[in-house]
From Swiss-Prot:
GO terms for cellular component: cytoplasm. The gene is hisA. It is an enzyme of class 5 (isomerase). One of its GO terms (biological process) is L-tryptophan biosynthetic process. This is 1-(5-phosphoribosyl)-5-[(5-phosphoribosylamino)methylideneamino] imidazole-4-carboxamide isomerase. It holds the Pfam family His_biosynth. It comes from Nitrobacter winogradskyi (strain ATCC 25391 / DSM 10237 / CIP 104748 / NCIMB 11846 / Nb-255). It catalyses: 1-(5-phospho-beta-D-ribosyl)-5-[(5-phospho-beta-D-ribosylamino)methylideneamino]imidazole-4-carboxamide = 5-[(5-phospho-1-deoxy-D-ribulos-1-ylimino)methylamino]-1-(5-phospho-beta-D-ribosyl)imidazole-4-carboxamide. NCBIfam families: 1-(5-phosphoribosyl)-5-[(5-phosphoribosylamino)methylideneamino]imidazole-4-carboxamide isomerase. Its EC number is 5.3.1.16. Belongs to the HisA/HisF family.
Length: 249
């Protein structure tokens, strides 16, 4: 069994922590004006690893919320995986040099697979690929466009590239609290050797329990956003279950 990590999500829009519904920037809810305060709260709750996305950057194709990200890096000791607007090796190098533990390459993984290979070779274990699927097909450009390739097609391209993880998001569920699409995520994880992290729709403690079932043994973790912000998921209870599963493994 993979060591399961529950990643609390910080999505940045105009320097603030927001949650979107199905990736729609027009359907954003602000949950905290200060990302540093939010990251500190997650650290105090016992989380081990932050998942941060520069939403504006994902649409712009380059970092936009760099100041907010850097403030979190300076003020909060937790490792961070960061996505959004990372489309070239220079940006990968810059973020890893500033203390980001792992970068997530999304759109560029579809458009420029050579970048993923180069980045993973230059920074072993510090490059992840974000695959966000709508009706099975991978969406790009901040989910504004849908490609003609499936998540599995792209994941298989990187089997031998040495990437740290694939973050698989079901766009149809994202931000709607309908529960993780574990069937699709497990099917992907069972078809490749790369660790897979589930995202999109995390709703309650039931998702944590499902994540720890034997059938999900190849999953490396999950990302939770709105369920934590809305109080539907008790972080203490969730982390207790995960730590108990680790101890028993």
């Amino acid at each position: 069994m993979e060591t399961v990590i529950l990643f609390p999500a910080i999505d940045l829009k105009s320097g603030q922590c927001v949650r979107l519904e199905q990736g729609d920037m027009a359907r954003a809810t602000v949950f905290n004006l200060d990302p540093v305060e939010q990251a500190r709260a997650f650290a105090a709750q016992g989380f081990e690893y932050l998942h941060v996305v520069d939403l504006d950057g994902a649409f712009a194709g380059k970092p936009v919320n760099a100041d907010a990200v850097e403030r979190v890096l300076r003020n909060v000791a937790l490792p961070m995986q960061l996505g959004g607007g990372i489309r070239d090796l220079k940006t990968v190098e810059a973020w890893l040099g500033k203390g980001v533990a792992r970068v997530i390459i999304g759109t560029a993984a579809v458009r420029d697979p050579v970048l993923v290979r180069e980045a993973a070779k230059a920074f072993p274990g510090r490059v992840a690929v974000g695959l966000d699927a709508r009706d099975g097909k991978v969406a790009v450009e901040g989910w504004a466009e849908t490609s003609e390739v499936t998540a599995l097609d792209i994941a298989r391209r990187f089997e031998d590239a040495g990437i740290a993880a694939i973050i698989f998001t079901d766009i149809a569920r994202d931000g709607l609290l309908k529960g993780l699409n574990l069937d699709a995520t497990i099917a992907l994880a069972d078809s490749i050797s790369i660790p897979v992290i589930a995202s999109g729709g995390f709703a309650s403690i039931a998702d944590v329990k499902a994540l720890l079932e034997p059938r999900a043994k190849k999953l490396a973790g999950a990302i939770s956003g709105r369920a934590l912000y809305d109080g539907r998921l008790d972080p203490v209870e969730a982390l207790k279950l995960i730590h108990a599963a680790r101890a028993a493994a």
